[in-house]
Amino acid sequence: MESYLNENFDVKAKHSSEEVLEKWRNLCGVVKNPKRRFRFTANLSKRYEAAAMRRTNQEKLRIAVLVSKAAFQFISGVSPSDYTVPEDVKAAGFEICADELGSIVESHDVKKLKFHGGVDGLAGKLKASPTDGLSTEAAQLSQRQELFGINKFAESEMRGFWVFVWEALQDMTLMILGVCAFVSLIVGIATEGWPKGSHDGLGIAASILLVVFVTATSDYRQSLQFRDLDKEKKKITVQVTRNGFRQKLSIYDLLPGDIVHLAIGDQVPADGLFLSGFSVVIDESSLTGESEPVMVNAQNPFLMSGTKVQDGSCKMMITTVGMRTQWGKLMATLTEGGDDETPLQVKLNGVATIIGKIGLFFAVVTFAVLVQGMFMRKLSTGTHWVWSGDEALELLEYFAIAVTIVVVAVPEGLPLAVTLSLAFAMKKMMNDKALVRHLAACETMGSATTICSDKTGTLTTNHMTVVKSCICMNVQDVANKGSSLQSEIPESAVKLLIQSIFNNTGGEVVVNKHGKTELLGTPTETAILELGLSLGGKFQEERKSYKVIKVEPFNSTKKRMGVVIELPEGGRMRAHTKGASEIVLAACDKVVNSSGEVVPLDEESIKYLNVTINEFANEALRTLCLAYMDIEGGFSPDDAIPASGFTCVGIVGIKDPVRPGVKESVELCRRAGITVRMVTGDNINTAKAIARECGILTDDGIAIEGPVFREKNQEELLELIPKIQVMARSSPMDKHTLVKQLRTTFDEVVAVTGDGTNDAPALHEADIGLAMGIAGTEVAKESADVIILDDNFSTIVTVAKWGRSVYINIQKFVQFQLTVNVVALVVNFSSACLTGSAPLTAVQLLWVNMIMDTLGALALATEPPNDELMKRLPVGRRGNFITNAMWRNILGQAVYQFIVIWILQAKGKAMFGLDGPDSTLMLNTLIFNCFVFCQVFNEISSREMEEIDVFKGILDNYVFVVVIGATVFFQIIIIEFLGTFASTTPLTITQWIFSIFIGFLGMPIAAGLKTIPV
């Protein structure tokens, strides 16, 4: 079976081709309810339709943008037609309406923008300040929202409970049974009268309704869970200035006139206009289909919702929100194609198909044998031409039994149990600070063999402080020095440092609404800004003193950032750079000495500074070098900042402590067979020191630098990669190469963390991409499969534990369900062949189906993870889903149950002294009761596939306890009180004890089976 499944039902967790997805669906036969079974799989036809629609819309948008841009270059003399402000807008105090605002950005209408007075003019008409933003007065915000709309897209309506009831009724076998129930009701009443003749028909109808409502309730609850998770995925916050104060705001609360701050990796949250910024490059491919990035500046100020900031940073003013934006219109035209199905869902569809075909064969044969037996009886009595109502009902019962065998034999619950388990796990993982974006990721994480983790913020706290410095060639402890540090540095050097720190930064020092000073920016930036403040610097004064000519933001390839400013005295230009110590120091040829003088950087000074860098790094400090140069001969914003000729001002050592619990988590991974590798852009000595502290770098492991790794050929990589535990000074492409090699060459299942825009390729390539929720950019999050909301490595280990739990829970459920399938099939088939009757009726089989399908999935697929899971080796990429241990347990239990039921069938009447007209009914009730209790105790045994102690932690899973309790309770009701509908009769106390004992006996047998090696 496994080889057939691997050949035909094997899909990748990510990036499966449409052909592969089509192939397995076409192989799925004997599907009782396609609507329900394939609800959580990608709708390929809608996906094709959506893709075609997207291409059409992108082409329209692309042409519109290009035509408008070209037209405005040539048509300079034409003025826009007069604009009349609508009365309701005028009454509210605004001078422009939403439609006019929308047309400006949508058409890139420069003429119309100029007509309204440019960006400042529009701000005035919107009653907004380009510096202070909107007023936070509730009445004004409400009025603005009423006139200009909210920043939300149209969503499909939530499907109600009755929709799921209707879907459950689409089951073909239940429809056939419904027809059987109706015919049985009519014939029964006609022959036996009311109410006696209605019992069989009403029994089947009631069973169908029970199955439908339990199924619908389960599906509806799942849909609510997915809805909640979908809302979590869409929660995006942006930095906004309102009332003159910077604050975080949900994108849903944005309004026209809001001032939004954007940086690399951010998604533009609504249509708007550029206010100020540097080197802003926008990726518009998601909207227009154009792969060429667009420069946005004062000349081309249009920013469109849904596009991504590829480089630079800026302030923008929102003009159009929600369904009025280009992105909103595009989203409204697209139909959701759905998430790709997970590998387990597909594999279990394969299992369901195989068993379904076997079940269909047995059902047909069983029906044929039962009918043949009936005809033989009638032939022997010579009544084959005469048919009574009772005989018609008997024939109908045979048909119902055959159909119900198909109901039981086609395990449609298998693939749906995966969804149930994943929904449960995803909801619980939210509480553990992990947001799963793609279903398959949760499942795949259970098979992970390698985690490639960032250092900063994941293994460390990301709370950074400058603790050491080497300024003007003097090493000093900065921590706890405060303002006294200023007096120990030459005044000229202090001025240079403050100038460098406050001008060459992506952060800001602001006063919040409570009147307190607040540092904004990345942890590295805020640590450096804190140093600038301790040196006596004043951020706003410093920024106003100099005109910024050019900014080159930090990126992980260059590993440095730069700025060119115009000095007030004489208009001279000065460049400042800051970044990785070795890289910036290599660009220096001069240094500021202890007297504050600029002197040539000789060999001795270089050696001293390199030793200092290594000493800082060996103390697990991140090191940054600050340098400057005076530019002679003028500088244009189009020029690149010089790459060399700088003067080194100083080196700072930043402490970023290791997170508590990381060392234990790394050790837990090692015991679980998961290799943890650190991939960082930091200095190799810093990386090694942190890696040793975390327990990642061992004596036999290798630490390597990205540039060295890049130079290796394939043969060298084959030997090197298994030993790599630390990669320092790595670029995003180094990370991508490492991940690709691990996956393709070494067949590892790789999880990768990332937070920056440049990490997107590695996150996309990995089996599981893990983006950081706090430090991560929107681009990184969009490329990821799981978002680690607290940026903590220990949370990644929790995700792995949940992934293993999902995988093993599904294995438990499959083992349990296949046992019921095998026994129910064999018992009814063999009984039909040998005795001419079936001991389990249609109503009874429907009840068994519910125990095994919906209730069984609820009980076994929602087991919470335990610590034992992380003591096993990972399944890896090639592991068999249905293991030898599972086959051993399935066949062992099936043989036991089959033997018990056959002994009862053959000797039951004699054993219990049953005689009289109701003896067969009594025996069949006893067989049914024993069969159900065998499933109840087998369900408990299935909690562990290898361990003998199956009661450990049973009370931690209240769902399991409730399901077992409910099953026993309803079984008592069915036997004792619903006999006329379920074809049962009340049992004696002795018979009840015997039934429970027979079921319980399966547990020691299951424990004994687990001792058999496989």
UniProtKB/Swiss-Prot annotation:
* Binding of Mg(2+), residues: D755, D759
Sequence segments annotated as region (Interaction with calmodulin): 20-31
Any single Gene Ontology cellular-component annotation: endoplasmic reticulum membrane
GO terms of molecular function: ATP binding; ATP hydrolysis activity; calcium ion transmembrane transporter activity; calmodulin binding; metal ion binding; P-type calcium transporter activity
Which membrane topology term applies here? Multi-pass membrane protein
Q: What is its EC number?
A: 7.2.2.10
Does the UniProt entry include the keyword Ligase? Answer: no
EC category name: translocase
In terms of one coarse class, where is the protein primarily found?
endoplasmic reticulum
Keyword DNA-binding recorded:
no
Q: Where are the transmembrane segments?
A: 161-181, 200-220, 349-368, 399-416, 811-829, 841-861, 882-904, 917-938, 957-978, 989-1010
Please list the residue ranges that the record places on the Lumenal side of the membrane.
182-199, 369-398, 830-840, 905-916, 979-988
Q: Which domain of life is it from?
A: Eukaryota
Per its record, the protein catalyses:
Ca(2+)(in) + ATP + H2O = Ca(2+)(out) + ADP + phosphate + H(+)
Pfam families from the UniProt entry: CaATP_NAI (PF12515), Cation_ATPase (PF13246), Cation_ATPase_C (PF00689), Cation_ATPase_N (PF00690), E1-E2_ATPase (PF00122), Hydrolase (PF00702)
Localization, UniProt:
Endoplasmic reticulum membrane
List modified residues, type N-acetylmethionine: M1
Active-site residues, record numbering mapped to chain: D454 (4-aspartylphosphate intermediate)
Q: Which residues carry this modification: Phosphoserine?
A: S45
Q: What are the entry keywords? A: Acetylation, ATP-binding, Calcium, Calcium transport, Calmodulin-binding, Endoplasmic reticulum, Ion transport, Magnesium, Membrane, Metal-binding, Nucleotide-binding, Phosphoprotein, Translocase, Transmembrane, Transmembrane helix, Transport
Provide the GO biological process annotations: calcium ion transmembrane transport
Q: What is known of its domains?
A: The N-terminus contains an autoinhibitory calmodulin-binding domain, which binds calmodulin in a calcium-dependent fashion.
UniProt-recorded name of the protein: Calcium-transporting ATPase 2, plasma membrane-type
State the organism named in the record: Arabidopsis thaliana
Q: What gene is this protein a product of?
A: ACA2
